[in-house]
């Protein structure tokens, strides 16, 4: 809401940061490429600050070992409600010191739900001893636990939507809902997930007292063998999730089976809305996901290459090479801007557990190399590019084959950069809510109305089939599924 003071101030700060970025911090070649729509240097309004993009918050470490928020020590919680309250405070602090989204795994709250249950049981034992039979005690414990469960989840839902970050927004946070039967607290996790879904179905009241769908937290629910509606133990949870999606559009869904195929047997959350990490192992050979992050994104304008190539493949590949090199240089600017940054720029991230536990004054450099964090190459307009080069979309040949070749080529280029630098470059289905229009507007101004390309006022995001294509949903999914696996970053 641009009439609100905090939002106005953030807009003004962002414009100053953009100006500094273009006049002082970036090479003129990259600035020109951005302004002319060859590439897009994402989030330049935050580039003057030493910020990274998105991450998976190491909530387990922060709750178990404590953290510090605004120079105040927060010790290990002893109840579910307190753990929920601390979680929302962590989320707000993290969001204020990065520009991308964050995700937390809700299973880390399971331990604290059990602590509350044990606390209630002890209270009853101390208060009533043998004067109450065990069945009565169990019933009272469950009643008290249900009240605390409801209050804790309500705290998360309402505080995330009412706490403001420094830019006047609600924190962009995703709750990862995974029923992992290898987890000691799986039954507690199931109870928490059920309550999250029930409260999301109900919604939150707006200023007029009407129940509406809250924007955050985003919910991501994992479908696995134990809950995929094929007789699994937790199918009932998935049925509630489906009811929730039908009414509130969330949760989104992740296939554990497909994730294990794609990520060396692992299942983990995206960082915020869509960005996924690459596999990385620590010194003990253990996979690590939480406490990792994305350094930043640069996107390439594919339709503009198609416009200039005019169906000539030799010219197309030459232009693609040149512009991918521009993207690489722009991404390395992001990387180098983070090198040498000290942990003091964001204590919640670098000193108190969200990502690391570095000392004051220590640089974050070791987390920028060797694949620990990622760099993302985004792309816009595979549909329009294919139409310009082959006269058809990626839904039919020869468009489909050409689109796959381009995707594979960009992915291979990311792999080459990774091998040369040790930085985890990967291909990214771009967050292009406005970029789809920006690129199309620039190209329309430069090249005029081109039928089925610039004349419609937008470019199609990443690998997707254009929304105007006369195609049923399942055929669309099938075609896109051949392309999305190349987009391993998002």
Task: Please provide the spans of the model-predicted regions.
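Conserved catalytic cores of very large enzyme subunits
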Residues: 2-371, 388, 392, 396-490
């Amino acid at each position: 809401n641009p009439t609100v003071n905090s939002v106005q101030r953030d807009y003004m700060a962002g414009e100053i940061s953009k100006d500094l970025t273009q006049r002082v911090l970036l090479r003129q070649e990259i600035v020109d490429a951005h302004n002319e729509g060859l590439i897009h240097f994402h989030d330049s309004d935050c580039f003057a600050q030493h910020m990274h993009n998105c991450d998976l918050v190491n909530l387990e470490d922060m709750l178990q070992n404590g953290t510090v928020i605004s120079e105040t020590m927060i010790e290990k919680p002893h109840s579910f409600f307190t753990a929920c309250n601390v979680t929302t405070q962590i989320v707000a602090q993290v969001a204020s010191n990065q520009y991308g989204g964050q995700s937390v795994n809700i299973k880390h709250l399971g331990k604290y739900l059990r602590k509350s249950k044990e606390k209630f049981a002890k209270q009853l034992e101390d208060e009533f001893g043998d004067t109450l039979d065990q069945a009565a005690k169990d019933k009272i414990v469950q009643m008290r636990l249900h009240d605390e469960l409801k209050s804790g989840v309500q705290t998360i839902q309402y505080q995330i939507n009412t706490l403001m970050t420094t830019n006047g927004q609600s924190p962009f946070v995703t709750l990862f809902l995974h029923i992992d039967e290898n987890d000691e607290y799986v039954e507690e996790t199931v109870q928490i997930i059920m309550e999250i879904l029930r409260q999301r179905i109900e919604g939150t009241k707006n200023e007029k007292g009407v129940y509406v769908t809250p924007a955050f937290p985003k919910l991501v629910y994992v479908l696995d063998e134990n809950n995929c509606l094929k007789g699994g133990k937790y199918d009932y949870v998935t049925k509630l999730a489906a009811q929730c999606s039908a009414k509130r559009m969330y949760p989104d869904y992740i296939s554990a089976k497909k994730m294990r195929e794609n990520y060396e047997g692992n299942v983990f959350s995206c960082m915020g809305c869509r960005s996924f990490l690459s596999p990385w192992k620590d010194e003990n050979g253990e996979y690590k996901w939480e406490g990792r992050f994305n350094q930043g994104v640069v996107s390439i304008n594919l339709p503009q290459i198609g416009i200039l190539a005019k169906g000539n493949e030799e010219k197309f590949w030459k232009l693609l090479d040149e512009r991918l090199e521009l993207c690489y240089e722009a991404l390395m600017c992001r990387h180098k801007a983070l090198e040498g940054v000290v942990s003091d720029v964001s204590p919640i991230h670098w000193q108190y557990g969200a990502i690391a536990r570095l000392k004051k004054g220590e640089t974050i450099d070791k987390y920028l190399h060797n694949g620990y964090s990622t760099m993302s190459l985004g792309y816009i307009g595979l549909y329009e590019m294919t139409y310009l080069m082959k006269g058809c979309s990626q839904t039919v040949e020869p468009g489909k084959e050409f689109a796959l070749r381009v995707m594979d080529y960009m992915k291979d280029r990311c792999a080459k950069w990774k091998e040369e630098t040790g930085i985890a470059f990967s291909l990214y289905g771009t967050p292009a809510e406005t970029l789809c229009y920006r690129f199309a507007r620039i190209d329309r101004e430069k090249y005029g109305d081109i039928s089925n390309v610039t004349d419609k006022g937008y470019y199609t995001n990443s690998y997707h089939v254009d929304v105007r294509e006369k195609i049923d949903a399942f055929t669309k999914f099938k075609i896109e599924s051949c392309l999305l696996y190349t987009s391993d970053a998002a």
